[in-house]
Amino acid sequence: MKKIVLLVTGCLFLQVIQAQPKQFQKADGKKIDTKLAETQITELMQQAEVTGLSIAVINDNKPLYVKAFGFKNKGQIAMNDTSTCFYGASLSKSLFAVMVMQLVEAGKLNLDKPIYTYLPKPIPEYDDYKDLSGDSRWKLITARHCLAHTTGFPNWRQFNPKENNKLEFFFTPGERYAYSGEGIALLQLVVETISGKPLETLAQEKIFRPLDMVRTSYLWQPQFENNFAVGHDFNEETLDKSKRTKANAAGSMETTIADYSKFLSALLRGKLISDKSRKEMTSKQIGIYTKHQFPSLNTDTTSANFGIELGYGLGWGVMKTPYGPAYFKEGHTDGWGHYCVSIPEKKWAILLMSNSSNGESIYKELLEKIAGLSIPWEWEGYIPFRQTAKLSEDVLGQYVGEYDGKLKATIILEDGKLKVSSKTVNMPKTNLYPINDHRFFLKIMETELDFIKGVDGKVTKVLLDDEGEKYELKKVVPKVETFVIPKSAYPNYLGNYVLSTDPKRKISIQNFKGVLVAKLSATETVPLIFMNFTQCSFKGVKDAQIEFILDGKGKVIKMKVQQNGLFEWIKQ
């Protein structure tokens, strides 16, 4: 295990060693040394357990710094590089918005003309939109509404707060902002109808091939197989890779840090659409006043973002910065988190792409350090990572066991980390992160655990705080069922056992008046209580478990003792 950890750490820092020393300009106009930036990046990644991250910085409207860090697949110890294909998630939407503006420039689409007028039949007559048949507001929807996320739809019908999986209006189109992939998908139908071409064909013709984005597509391509990343969850476990075979303007794009930075650069240089079209696309169409972007239909308001005039343009979020107006876009799903922001007046942009659920937790601090830029991180949901304490396995081991109450939980020690699972709430094994020597938290949900000890110093229960809901779970003391070892088998256990990590430490198994005992020291001898031929415990010691290991011939060769950690004792 130690060898693997060293290899992993070395791989992460290998990216820094190979980087060429140079500087790049931050949003505030100041320059930062590349080595300093990379040190800050790798430190944040390690602290927050960000498995993989790629970064591109655009200066003078051109990609200047493009770098990959960490793993594309940690399970295989395979590293990211700048040609590694990442799932682009909602970065798909902003690229699609540019294609829409190209149709507007060509006079084929009017942003304010109801989109149903471009279709051969009423929208509710399409199978995907039959849910809208009872509400005539579908006739009001325009391309502007779709790109500005003001259609009135939920993000996706499966997220309908009524839990009916239906597509329906929650407000009249144009009334307010509510992020919606459904609106983008509907506009895709219109674009494909107007152009007479599938989305992928249109994207290849208008953007991918002209910009030499050879590793970008709305569909999974065979050439991606040789170098692609998988997502990683909060515990840095790999997630299954979805290889999409249906083009979706709202989120099926596969791309690389190198390719997408070409797109951002071309947009700044006026290569894809005119400056006039870009300004319209990135001008505020609707103000945003909600506390959080998601859930998309939430109505909790805040004045926190009044100062930056947070709003939405056409396919892009918009805000004011001290360095000029900016437009931005995110991409997010389990195991993936991306963010890009451009400031045209500075000819500057930055792109962050992470194949880790922990990635977004460093974006606030990362952008402040290497870009000199503050973003509406709370609205984005980019909650900064929490610092964790460093605890030994001896300390962690005392919390291992079964816990019972309104919920049932099992806590184990694995690879130097505490992990909890609960069949009661269908929670698979997940890491516990220490705040101090008795308090822990989960990353997958807002839950804290506080372990309580009795007067004897042993853990008796754990208190759970699950987003304000309190639970008390008592630690289960296992009942020990005795098993009688035949005296004829005693010689197999007798002898001296030395600690594998410290041969000077010794336990002697002896036959004392017909009872097998463990002589732990010159003054302490404890009887063994057997559950079977290989498992036993020390009498009177509730938190110690012993397992005798046999060779192929059934002879005892060592014993393992679990007590505040796992220790191996070799039979001499």
Go through each PLM region and give its residues:
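Bacterial Sec-dependent N-terminal signal peptides
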Residues: M1-Q23
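A general lysine-centric signal
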Residues: K2-K3, K93, K329, K571
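Hydrophobic transmembrane-helix microenvironments that flank and shape a buried ionizable site
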Residues: L12, Y87-S90, T256
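Catalytic loop of the DD-peptidase/beta-lactamase superfamily, centered on the K-T-G motif
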Residues: Q20-K67, T201-E205, R209, K241-D502, ...
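Surface-exposed patches in mature extracellular/periplasmic domains of secreted proteins
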Residues: G52-I55, D131, Q158-F159, Y218, ...
